[in-house]
């Protein structure tokens, strides 16, 4: 799932290109990121839920209390986005991402 970057009342700064891999588990998401790296495409995960951070755990926050945050986190993949990407780079990223997601999810 790719969220739109523009709408009637908003426009993205295009700082990050975040996708969600519907139906992917935490482990499958990790496998997708690893396979993309093997193809030369560096992906990442942004916005780790606060209850997963040690400081918040030490204050008593528990991930179980925030199921929606975890659900978004577990299958989120951030694709490369920067001003030096050529059209060919974008095509390469998209093609490989689609192939890898299909390979991992079957």
Name each model-derived stretch:
Residues 1-106:
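PLP-dependent aminotransferase class I/II
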């Amino acid at each position: 799932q790719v969220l739109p970057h523009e709408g009637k009342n908003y426009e993205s700064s295009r700082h990050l290109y975040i996708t969600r891999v519907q139906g992917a588990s935490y482990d499958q998401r990790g496998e997708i990121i690893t396979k993309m790296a093997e193809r030369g495409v560096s992906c990442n995960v942004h916005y780790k839920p606060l209850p997963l951070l040690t400081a918040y755990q030490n204050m008593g926050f528990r991930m179980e209390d925030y199921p929606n945050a975890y659900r978004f986190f577990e299958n989120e993949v951030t694709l490369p986005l920067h001003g030096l990407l050529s059209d060919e780079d974008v095509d390469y990223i998209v093609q490989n991402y689609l192939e890898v997601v299909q390979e991992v999810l079957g």
